[in-house]
């Protein structure tokens, strides 16, 4: 078993967002370590290309022999890496925005005679009729239910609510 595989996920975390050199099965890789899989020890490396594009490389954990840090990077690199897989339309919400969206949606559902409760430690998840949940940021794609009919209807209602409130 390689030195890399013997490390714990907490030790692997020390390499995240750093530029590293990985030796794996007689091949050498260089790049910014984005993440490691805690079960398989697989590594995801990112390289920023000159034309602005990205190169993403996955390295199987069992093939990794050594990993060494080349440079620490700065906050700009870390920011870029943190948003590598975020969709272009992904935007952050402040806690106040989320509270406002949750309250607005809950009131609207209650106004339309749909039974809704809050659940979870922070009461952030809305639960509709005990069979559907809506997580922040309370959009149609944040609904989950095993009942496809209810899921579809509630998603349509939420979409209508969002369209009307804009």
Swiss-Prot record:
GO process annotations (BP): spliceosomal complex assembly; spliceosomal snRNP assembly
Chief place of localization: nucleus
Gene Ontology MF terms: RNA binding
Coiled-coil zones: none
AD domain mapped to chain residues: 68-166
Keyword Coiled coil on entry: no
Any one cellular-component term (Gene Ontology): Gemini of Cajal bodies
Pfam families, alphabetized: Gemin6, Gemin6_C
Compartments, record wording: Nucleus, Nucleoplasm; Nucleus, Gem; Cytoplasm
Alphabetical UniProt keywords: Cytoplasm, mRNA processing, mRNA splicing, Nucleus, Phosphoprotein
Domain Sm: 4-73
InterPro entries attached to this UniProt entry: AD, Gemin6, Gemin6_C, Gemin6_Sm-like_dom, Sm
Residue numbers of Phosphoserine PTMs: 94, 165
Subunit structure: Part of the core SMN complex that contains SMN1, GEMIN2/SIP1, DDX20/GEMIN3, GEMIN4, GEMIN5, GEMIN6, GEMIN7, GEMIN8 and STRAP/UNRIP. Part of the SMN-Sm complex that contains SMN1, GEMIN2/SIP1, DDX20/GEMIN3, GEMIN4, GEMIN5, GEMIN6, GEMIN7, GEMIN8, STRAP/UNRIP and the Sm proteins SNRPB, SNRPD1, SNRPD2, SNRPD3, SNRPE, SNRPF and SNRPG. Interacts with GEMIN7; the interaction is direct. Interacts with GEMIN8; the interaction is direct. Interacts with SNRPB, SNRPD2, SNRPD3 and SNRPE; the interaction is direct.
Function recorded in the entry: The SMN complex catalyzes the assembly of small nuclear ribonucleoproteins (snRNPs), the building blocks of the spliceosome, and thereby plays an important role in the splicing of cellular pre-mRNAs. Most spliceosomal snRNPs contain a common set of Sm proteins SNRPB, SNRPD1, SNRPD2, SNRPD3, SNRPE, SNRPF and SNRPG that assemble in a heptameric protein ring on the Sm site of the small nuclear RNA to form the core snRNP (Sm core).
Protein name stated in the entry: Gem-associated protein 6
Protein species of origin: Mus musculus
């Amino acid at each position: 078993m390689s030195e890399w595989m013997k490390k714990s996920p907490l030790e692997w975390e020390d390499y995240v967002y750093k530029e590293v050199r990985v030796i794996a099965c007689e091949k050498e890789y260089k790049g910014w370590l984005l993440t490691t899989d805690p079960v398989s020890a697989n590594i995801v490396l990112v390289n920023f290309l000159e034309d602005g594009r990205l190169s993403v490389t996955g390295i199987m954990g069992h093939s990794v022999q050594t990993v060494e840090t080349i440079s620490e990077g700065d906050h700009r690199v870390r920011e870029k890496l943190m948003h590598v897989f975020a969709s272009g339309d992904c935007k952050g919400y402040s806690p106040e925005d989320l509270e406002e969206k949750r309250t607005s949606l809950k009131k609207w559902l209650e106004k339309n005679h749909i039974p809704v409760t809050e659940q979870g430690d922070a009461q952030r998840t809305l639960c509709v009729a005990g069979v559907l949940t809506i997580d922040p940021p309370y959009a149609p794609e944040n609904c989950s239910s095993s009942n496809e009919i209810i899921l579809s209807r509630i998603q349509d209602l939420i979409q209508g609510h969002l369209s009307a409130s804009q």
